[in-house]
A protein has these predicted regions:
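C-terminal motif of bacterial Sec signal peptides marking the signal peptidase cleavage site
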Residues: 15-17
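Aromatic sugar-binding surface patches on proteins
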Residues: 90-99
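Sec-dependent N-terminal signal peptides
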Residues: 4-13
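N-terminal edge beta-strand
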Residues: 21-49, 54
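Short, solvent-exposed loop/linker segments at beta-strand-coil boundaries, enriched for Pro/Gly
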Residues: 57-58, 63-83
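Short, exposed beta-strand-loop hairpins at the edges of beta-sheets
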Residues: 114-128
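Interdomain boundary/hinge segments at the C-termini of tandem beta-sandwich modules
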Residues: 134-137
Length: 138
């Protein structure tokens, strides 16, 4: 009986996640690739970046203007961050996080969301981002 209840809860959880993904566009970013990812979003639209971290990256950092600290993850962005969710990133294992944003750009220029890993961030005063995501708001 317990197996059936657990299975039912698992199915409900997956349905909930599918519904959420249907409402928000999700863009995948694989960290430590050293390349710029570019995405187009509409003004006012909510979108998500699904960040995949390679083993050895125990947290990731977004380098931009606003600062909001939570657990091991440091978030800095020009965008309104709605919320984030995902697997807690542990040293030496694969992890992922979803960051949900709302495109609130007032200018025509693309916005950059810059990432680096915690090790790079802590070793340097002005860390260079290892990843850049370019967001074009139409």
């Amino acid at each position: 009986m317990t197996k059936y209840i657990l299975f039912f809860l698992f199915v409900l959880l997956n349905l909930y996640n599918c519904e959420k993904e249907d409402k928000v566009k999700i863009y995948d970013v694989i960290l430590n690739q050293g390349k710029t990812n570019e995405f187009n979003v509409k003004k006012g639209e909510e979108f998500a970046l699904r960040l995949f971290c390679s083993p050895g990256t125990n947290s990731l950092i977004l380098l931009n203007k606003k600062e909001n600290q939570d657990s091991l993850t440091y978030i800095k962005s020009d965008y309104e961050i709605v919320h984030y969710e995902g697997e807690e990133l542990g040293l030496g294992r694969m992890g992922y996080l979803y960051y949900y944003f709302k495109a609130t750009s007032e200018t025509e220029e693309p916005k950059l969301i810059k990432f680096t890993d915690a090790y790079t961030y802590l070793q340097k005063e002005n860390p260079t981002p290892t990843e850049i995501v370019k967001i074009n708001v139409n």
